[in-house]
């Protein structure tokens, strides 16, 4: 992630959403009504405005030397760093199974579903599973907690690596669940922060 400063508002930490080494940085910034920084970005930021970026920071990045399965868990705009990790793994030619779970409250809270669905249909080692915590009128998405979906699908995570990003409560619950399924602490990677 990086610490991003916009003129006149508090600095915030945001995860990069694009692959490393690109000539630009991509950030996904959720608009939080009343949030000083996200309000500024949504209402006032213009092309050409100066932005200060400090980083990269944190420890949640793809470990390309890992050859076992990968579990990627995202909640809300936590999809940004997971997008970077998954796209980097695919672009690097990693062939192990990659299971991406994207938890959201409602269908309105989902984004990039078409993007990841296309990637999953292009790469046979990628599985993409959006999970809605509130019951949906659509039968296109699984419902329930993202942690319950993972437990239902995967009974043993021994030898896996997990990358998580999202709300702190989801990260905490996921970390407990991952350890219960046999994942070692050193194989769980997440940078936990909240940026209104």
Model-flagged regions — what are they?
Residues 97, 101-196:
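Reductase modules of NAD(P)H-dependent flavoproteins
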Residues 20, 63-66, 92-94, 156:
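Short, flexible hinge/linker loops that cap or flank conserved catalytic cores
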Residues 1-49, 104-106, 131-135:
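Ferredoxin-reductase
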Residues 77-82, 170:
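Hydrophobic/small residue at the entry helix of a nucleotide-binding pocket
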Residues 55-67:
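A short, basic/flexible loop-to-alpha-helix module at the beginning of a structural domain
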Residues 81-91:
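Histidine-anchored nucleotide/phosphate-binding helix
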Residues 70-72, 163:
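Conserved beta-strand elements of the Class I
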